[in-house]
Curated annotation (Swiss-Prot):
TM annotation in the entry: 381-401
Recorded topology in the membrane: Single-pass membrane protein
Alphabetized UniProt keyword annotations: Cell membrane, Glycoprotein, Membrane, Metal-binding, Nucleus, Protein transport, Transmembrane, Transmembrane helix, Transport, Zinc, Zinc-finger
Glycosylation sites: N21, N242, N291, N540, N645, N649, N652, N662, N669, N673, N688, N722
Ranges of Low complexity composition bias in the record: 27-37, 646-677, 718-727
BED-type ZnF: 66-122
Encoding gene (name): VID22
Biased composition (Polar residues): 1-10
Modification comment: Glycosylated.
Protein name as annotated: Vacuolar import and degradation protein 22
Length: 901
């Protein structure tokens, strides 16, 4: 071990203070940082930092994890899960708490709020005595390897030094970080380069850099190009880091010949590898086109640190420049990614595209595969964008498709306001609304505004009823105006009814207002779905099928109450489209797996039977185990080294070079314990299933309920890859294929154990969670449906019960309860398979369109016309990261996420 700089140790607490002069305050420590990783900077002595206390040995936290975040250098830990860390400065122990901020965020907040220490400061670097309370960081002077400081070498004093040259050099070094910051600001805000020519800006620059000579337009342009290039390199480094965590290396020199002992060895090694897999950043891709001008192929991943889904553009192309160019095709773009970012495809789970693109792509990619050919179902890789599905299905509510034989006048937008996110999601450009209620409303408002006498009369009626007249017409180019127009017109109903009684016009009757009401309720609910799936919320891929089924139920319920054909026909067409797409989505194995990880679905008997053709959860586990095995086996690169040592026996077990951890030690008994409990509650007729629309009772978890299903430890010998532990042959020659089969058998068992543990936990927690959530949020359940309890101030009325449609139930009740379940489950006893699956589902793109890109609706680059791609990349990165603190030469996506503003 390397020696660490002189340290001061507290006698009372035995804490190791930072390697600094005793006269320097802790506030001074906040000012020091370097741009290198914790494991390469400074000298350290881990033994002197270690602390034995209450039977636990506290060691430097960075030694327990592969995470190289600098804040870890300021803490001690006791286990590799880092359930608790001890501050080296004050001895405070920070523990992982459920349903709270992450451990990393809590630790960094403690450093800054308590000790005024920058979490990005390197604990092991040199400390510079600047003024206490200073908020900027100072790099320590370079050391002369022959002794002394580079600035005190006597030989240097004998040299003739060009003072002007040194001054210019120092000015340039001081200006470069400022140029980078200016480049980030200009690109992120889409400012013109003339921004830096502003007198106030240049005065501010001069005060910070003491020089203006190096701040010019070319320097900023080069900085923008450099940052954008380095963003791709950050993704590249992340991909390489992912690949390093994929190798499962088995040293046959240490394998025991006894089948049972060898099974335990391989099981522990595999569980260790699964623990490492949890650190991988899984990715998904998506493609979208904005404003019919900008094509973007983006990457999406889940940020563990902030519990947020983040997205970054990979390829940005101007459609006007590449009109009908083969470079715009999805296969060409995927090929470009695999060439420029080698290794990235190894951890890309899928790509999400509009339905029309997927149909074309599946026929092409067979000959040019981007994903490995391990799945028999290609739909596992190519997901349908739920936004494009809804867009295609909802069009009949607005009118009929425009005829190609008829020339329709091009409508200009009524509003000068910027386009909203909703405007970019639904395209109505090919819809003829002439026979719809929207056309009637627009005609009424046009006639009203064209006659000043009628307009004055209408406004006087508005004043009489206490309304302010606002002309809210439906703009075909702005989908968001649909609900605004309907709601405004509905609010004006009493005024309209009185007005039209004295005017000879086509009158709005009761049916018209009912149509408006039905449309408004449906469109408001659909808009909530659209916003949900374009947000950065994690787990929204898990709710894709749930959302489609909720829309279907809402439409069926609405059609059951409609009595006029004018609205029945478009709603039936809408429903038919949704049901067609539902069938397509159910053919996607990844969607089925995602639905299984939505706890509320497990209580829906009809849904389970439709999805898996059985209501037996044990049979469902058997089916899903195979899918999960195929999915995760792709990320287990098995490598065997060495030869079997025949002299090894059970006494040599301690020589096995395998490290178990606290998480994996408790897994082995889960399935057995859960199965014993579940057997006592088993009912062969499955009468315990809830047939209501909501989780009202326990689900029946029966590991032996399936015709061919048994518990993992009860599996008979299988001549194929699935070998039970008892069938491992006692041979003196273990081939690679034999070891691979044994690993596969153990892997399958771990998968099934975790799935049964998940079902058992859902069974015990979710029903209680629904009751608790409804009580706290004023929801009540009546005959399988939810209602909102509204408490009024009227003593006679008391409280009202407001019915909820199926979409409202999904977003207001099911999603919050399921999210709370996952937060609690992951903070406690979730197994490694479930944790990996959860992370994979979090990274999946449910929509090819994300809200973060909505600024592209009317985007025009102001920096430079040739830097559109670079500007978009930097803006999106800066919106989601602290771009000014990122080390573009060293950071990965994981480490870049941990910088605090």
């Amino acid at each position: 071990m390397r020696a660490m700089d002189t340290q001061v140790q507290s006698a009372e607490r035995g804490l190791v203070l930072p390697p600094m002069n005793s006269t320097v305050s802790s506030a001074t420590a906040a000012t020091t940082a370097t741009n290198t990783d914790t494991d390469t900077d400074g000298d350290r002595d881990e033994e002197r930092e270690s602390l034995a206390e209450d039977g636990s040995e506290w060691v430097p936290a960075y030694m327990l994890t592969r995470d190289r975040s600098r804040y870890l250098g300021h803490f001690l830990g006791v286990d590799k899960m880092l359930e608790a860390v001890k501050c080296k400065y004050c001895g405070v122990i920070i523990r992982r708490q459920g349903n709270s901020i992450s451990m990393a965020e809590a630790s960094q907040t403690h450093l800054w709020s308590t000790h005024k220490i920058d979490p990005n400061a390197n604990y092991y670097s040199g400390w510079t005595g600047v003024e206490a309370g200073s908020t900027f960081m100072v790099r320590p002077p370079l050391k002369n390897h022959q002794g002394g400081s580079a600035t005190t070498n006597s030989i240097a004093n004998l040299l003739e030094i060009d003072e002007d040259f040194l001054k210019r050099t120092r000015e340039k070094e001081m200006a470069l970080p400022l140029v980078q910051s200016l480049a980030i600001i200009i690109a992120s805000e889409n400012l013109p380069l003339s921004f830096v020519d502003n007198t106030a800006v240049r005065l501010l620059i001069n005060q910070n850099a003491n020089s203006l000579s190096f701040i010019d337009h070319d320097l900023i342009l080069n900085a923008i190009r450099s940052i954008a290039y380095n963003l791709d390199r950050i993704i590249q480094r992340t991909a390489l880091r992912n690949n390093s965590d994929l190798s499962l290396i088995i040293d046959k020199n240490y394998l025991l010949m006894d089948p049972t002992d060898r099974s335990n060895q391989l099981s522990n090694r595999l569980k260790n590898q699964l623990f490492e897999m949890q650190k991988i950043n899984f990715f998904s891709l998506s493609h979208s086109v904005w404003n019919n001008t900008i094509s973007i192929l983006s990457i999406q991943y889940y940020d563990d640190f902030h519990s947020q889904v983040k997205t970054l553009p990979l390829i940005i192309q101007n459609l006007h420049e590449y009109n009908n160019d083969p470079k715009l095709s999805i296969p060409a773009q995927l090929l470009k990614i695999s060439q420029e970012l080698p290794g990235l495809q190894n951890t890309v789970i899928s790509i999400t595209l509009p339905r029309s693109q997927i149909v074309d792509l599946l026929n092409v990619m067979d000959s040019q595969p981007f994903f490995p050919n391990t799945y028999t179902n290609a739909k596992n890789y190519y997901h349908n964008c739920i936004i494009s599905i809804i867009n295609s299905a909802i069009l009949p509510l607005f009118g009929t498709p425009k005829s190609a034989d008829i020339t329709h006048p091009r409508q200009s937008s009524f509003s000068k306001e910027p386009l909203t996110l909703l405007d970019s999601l639904i395209d109505l450009s090919n819809i003829d609304i002439s026979n719809s209620i929207f056309s009637r409303i627009n005609s009424f408002l046009d006639d009203l505004q064209s006659n000043s006498w009628q307009l004055d009369k209408f406004r006087s009626l508005c004043e009489k009823f206490g309304f302010e007249f606002v002309c809210s017409k439906f703009d075909l180019s702005r989908y968001s105006t649909a609900t605004v127009s309907l709601q405004t017109f509905l609010n004006l109903r009493p005024i309209i009814e009185e007005y039209q009684s004295s005017i000879q016009i086509e009158k709005f009757n009761e049916i018209d207002f009912q149509i408006i009401d039905y449309l408004l309720i449906t469109l408001n609910s659909i808009n909530r779905i659209l916003k949900f799936f374009t947000s950065s919320k994690s787990l929204n891929f898990t709710y894709v099928l749930f959302a489609i089924m909720s829309i279907e139920k809402h439409l069926l319920s609405t059609l059951g109450s409609l009595q006029f054909q004018r609205l029945i026909a478009p709603f039936e067409t809408f429903l038919s489209k949704i049901q067609e797409f539902k069938t397509i989505l159910f053919s996607d194995d990844m969607n089925l797996l995602a639905m299984f990880l939505c706890p509320a679905i497990l209580f829906e008997r009809e849904v389970l039977e439709y999805s898996f053709h059985t209501i037996s959860l044990s049979e469902i586990v058997d089916k899903l185990s195979t899918s999960i095995f195929s999915l995760l086996k792709r990320f287990l690169n098995l490598h065997t080294i060495g030869n079997v040592n025949n002299s090894h026996n059970t006494s040599n077990h301690s020589n096995m070079n395998i490290h178990t951890d606290n998480q994996t030690n408790n897994i082995n008994n889960r399935s057995g314990n859960n199965s014993d409990n579940n057997d006592n509650e088993h009912d062969n007729d499955n009468d315990n299933h809830s047939n209501s629309n909501t989780p009202a009772s326990r689900i029946d978890i029966d590991p032996t309920g399936g015709e061919n299903s048994v518990l993992p430890e009860q599996q008979p010998q299988n001549s194929n890859n699935n070998l039970s532990f008892g069938s491992l042959s006692d041979t003196h020659h273990l081939s690679d294929s034999t070891i691979s089969k044994e690993i596969d058998s153990i892997f399958l068992q771990i998968i099934q154990e975790d799935l049964y543990d998940y079902l058992s936990t859902v069974n015990s927690i979710v029903p209680i969670s629904y009751r608790s959530y409804c009580e706290q949020s004023n929801f009540i359940r009546d005959s399988g449906r939810f209602k909102k309890r509204i408490i009024t101030e009227d003593s006679i009325i008391g409280e009202l019960e407001q019915p909820m449609n199926f979409i409202e139930e999904l977003l207001d009740i099911h999603v919050p309860v399921c999210n709370a379940f996952w937060s609690q489950y992951l903070d406690n006893d979730a197994g490694p398979i479930i944790r990996i699956l959860f992370k994979i589902m979090q990274c999946q793109s449910s929509s090819s369109i994300r809200g973060e890109y909505s600024f592209l609706n009317d985007f025009i680059p102001r920096v430079h016309p040739d830097l559109t791609q670079e500007i978009i990349k930097i803006k999106l990165f800066n919106d989601q990261f602290v771009a000014s603190k990122v080390d573009y030469d060293l950071d990965t996506l994981q480490t870049a996420s941990q910088y605090l503003p």
